[in-house]
Amino acid sequence: MDKILILDFGGQYTQLIARRIRDLNVYSEIVDYDISIEEIIKKNPKGIILSGGYDSVYGDRSIKPNKGIWDLNIPILGICYGFQVMMQENGGQVENDKDSEEYGSTDIRLTTNELFENIELDNNCWMSHSDSVIFLPKGFKVIASTNKCLVASACNREKKFYGVQFHPEVTQTTFGNQLLQNFVYSICDVAGDWEPKNIKLEKIEEIKSIVKDDYVLCAISGGVDSLVAAVLTAQAIGDKLYCVFVDHGLLRKNESQEVCALLKKLIGKNIFLVDQKQLFLSKLKGVVDPEQKRKIIGKTFIEVFEKVANKINVPFKYLLQGTIYPDIVESGSKFSKTIKSHHNVGGLPERLQFELLEPLKYLFKDEVRKLGLSLDIPYQNVYRQPFPGPGLAVRVLGEITEDKLEIVREADFLFRSYIDQLYKNSEHKPWQYFTVLTNSKSVGVVGDNRSYGYTLALRAVDSMDAMSAKWYKIPLEHLEKISSIICNKVKNISRVVYDITNKPPGTIEWE
């Protein structure tokens, strides 16, 4: 299978680059910026992309790729910081020039070049840089400019080195997808054979080669990711997989029963339901910080699994988790800053007795869904809404109590039921929609009496891969009806508000 290697210099969009390449049916893999030449040769990529980053290439602590990368005779595309690294390492010069700083949407003038094939020459791109290339290496020429940045793109056609100061991976660069397509297909000459059926076969073989004759304990959370991971692993190793579903009391209405029924149907045997509602509530008592909630839940999950594993009396070696790419992104990579820890990657204790098995960790959400369909998981289950591993604990702001959980659980059920009915015949249904119980109270009126209840937030977004999201524009008349239904049917709710924050700057979940 042809692949594109992406060297990660810590930029916030590195995983988005990988996502865009995979959209083109080309496998992409993210590796550390300082990967050895031997390892690159072993991976045998058709092309290399150098990601953006936070540093300045001329700084004392700047990070650079292995120098041998320029002699591999492999096409290379540098993006933002990656472009500047390419220029400096090949004899060019980069400086901080206040007059050439650019942030946001920027008009750009392209020249005729294979990188810009089938692209309008007068166009618009997304810039985010304070440093600029001021002197080109020998053999390079300028192929794009803006009013402030004379070297917005450059190339050495003989070596097949290309660089852009802007970000083609973000949707704000209107021609970005076409540029990436030109690079991978026209310049790198890839086959384009990255498809769900290939993912399935590759992942099954990967699991078999890792697990061999050992046993796997699966951590089922109730979400799409852990379900797909479990069914995939079951097809790979059969009866050596044991699934444990922990009811931590933080699930949506009727979810525990629905998940267990589905697991028995899809996997069959070795399914264990563990009721630990009171344990999790006791551990979370008095905790208000969202990071602490996530870590406590992750740690408690592992403690429960260790006890269950001992009771089952099977020599488990691996713990299966449904970690996917966005989970890892938001928990911070080698150089990027942590947005929030993920329960699968940020809360595990050092004494963990299992080795982790995470077959989905390099897949995006829509790729996981496609994989799920190829595994014959029913469509309605594959395309159910994303639900965080910590469950309603991160949808109740402040301290977790049984009363608060019941409030947000019932409100969430009413909201989701209304939206499901409203958009049942529409192709433009929100990607994710849920309620958040804030820790704020406000005065209301019930009948002739004063009330003092919680403020509930409604959240609905449109997204493809959870890397970015836009708030969904539910018609106002329906928001009014939803508010009325919730306030009338759910006790202790006196006010309903609608969250209109995109991601970025916000995250999809509130905590």
UniProtKB/Swiss-Prot annotation:
Catalytic activity: XMP + L-glutamine + ATP + H2O = GMP + L-glutamate + AMP + diphosphate + 2 H(+)
Molecular-function GO term, any one: GMP synthase activity
Active site feature: 80 (nucleophile), 167, 169
The Glutamine amidotransferase type-1 domain, residue ranges: 3-193
Domain GMPS ATP-PPase as annotated: residue spans: 194-384
GO cellular component labels: cytosol
Keywords, comma-separated and alphabetical: ATP-binding, Glutamine amidotransferase, GMP biosynthesis, Ligase, Nucleotide-binding, Purine biosynthesis
E.C. code: 6.3.5.2
Binding positions (ATP): 221-227
UniProt-listed Pfam families: GATase, GMP_synt_C
The keyword Protein biosynthesis is annotated on this UniProt entry: no
Pathway: Purine metabolism; GMP biosynthesis; GMP from XMP (L-Gln route): step 1/1
Keyword Ligase appears in the UniProt entry: yes
InterPro entries assigned: Class_I_gatase-like (IPR029062), GATASE (IPR017926), GMP_synth_C (IPR001674), GMP_synth_GATase (IPR004739), GMP_synthase (IPR022955), GMPS_ATP_PPase_dom (IPR025777), Rossmann-like_a/b/a_fold (IPR014729)
Root EC class: ligase
Record-linked CDD domains: GATase1_GMP_Synthase, GMP_synthase_C
Oligomer and partners: Homodimer.
Function noted in UniProt: Catalyzes the synthesis of GMP from XMP.
Record-given protein name: GMP synthase [glutamine-hydrolyzing]
Organism: Malacoplasma penetrans (strain HF-2) (Mycoplasma penetrans)
Record gene name: guaA
